[in-house]
Amino acid sequence: MITPILLIKATVDGMIARRFGRIVNITSSAVKHPIDILGLSNGARTGLTGFVAGLARKTVGHNVTINNLLPGPFDTDRLRSTIAIQAKTSGRTPEEVVRDRHKANPAGRFGDPAEFGELCAFVCSAQAGYITGQNFLIDGGAYPGTL
């Protein structure tokens, strides 16, 4: 939480002076649905989200937006290594773990990193100037809430 806040503080004034800036924090879907074994991470990510909520409303009048991307499971090296560990500890194959994880997600799959990148590119674009202080949950519909 501290490092992203310090980076924002170090760059936001220059963006305001130029009257253009886009800040995008990559946090986690755990901001909306905390993961029980990641207590400190849940708290730090939620703290950053709270910081952004206040600051984003002060900077948007200068064409500087600040938003958060909250990814769920994406098909990355990290996810594959986590699946391998989960398979080993549960006595299943990685393919079985993937199948079960896919079944648990309404989209029936993991996210494609390109999908994540495309959303990030849009949020950074000039066309996204009216979007600020938002948390974009990208999880294939896994989070069951409405807010």
Can you annotate each of these PLM segments?
Residues 33, 121, 132-147:
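Short C-terminal tail/terminal secondary-structure segment
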Residues 32, 71-85:
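Short, flexible catalytic-loop segment of classical short-chain dehydrogenase/reductase
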Residues 8-9, 53:
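A short, exposed helix-loop element centered on a Lys and neighboring polar residues
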